[in-house]
């Protein structure tokens, strides 16, 4: 749900930016932040609390037996060659994204937000430098995925233990490369680190640059378990008429509202994993309360079906 003015340029360039990272400096964290960070927008909360299963895992065999074909599978046992790493800041967020903050450790992708003073690009694709008090990681898949006439159903799946901690938001989402939101964006999972028994889903689309025509697309889904305590499997099933969100194999939300889901059909998406510090979910952010944290990703898989 990253809907702000310069985002179209950032999304168009982010997947190409794999730079040398931000330069550390010795200046102490000064405790100041961005006082204009907006809080969550008006929201719809699912009246049903979803049942979550700690350390749940998906069965590839069960899916293939039901007509699904696996087209992408990264279990993070090797390197990050399937992904591009973003470098730089992002509007309304506090961190400098660095490739070094996304690492594979013992077969798990770890995206870590750290409190440290650095200088780096003010924003993605902007050579102007700025000072930051935090670093974090943002990866974007090199491969694209699309629900279209050939593959009308797409399931994008990730097994994640979200980050815990004030000021952090674990994101698992997709976007279409190009001027936002003309190629669409699908927010599979958004979890605030200080509210880890709830996750949000959303989507964006509009034919005009920087104009999201989706009305009321965001939904907050309460769950029975702390999503940061263990791994959970998040699935977004994308069809021409709906965005169906599954948690640990169970349908949580069938999103048909917003008026624009049909316009996402045929627009190729890249998968994105990120852990921003601050941003749109935190109003009047108190920097002193941010301690950092890690988002753990066991795997990312994509399945298609006719």
Model-identified regions with their sequence ranges:
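Bacterial N-terminal signal peptides that target proteins for export
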Residues: 1-10
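Intrinsically disordered, low-complexity serine/threonine-rich segments
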Residues: 11-12, 24
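C-terminal motif of bacterial Sec signal peptides marking the signal peptidase cleavage site
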Residues: 18-21
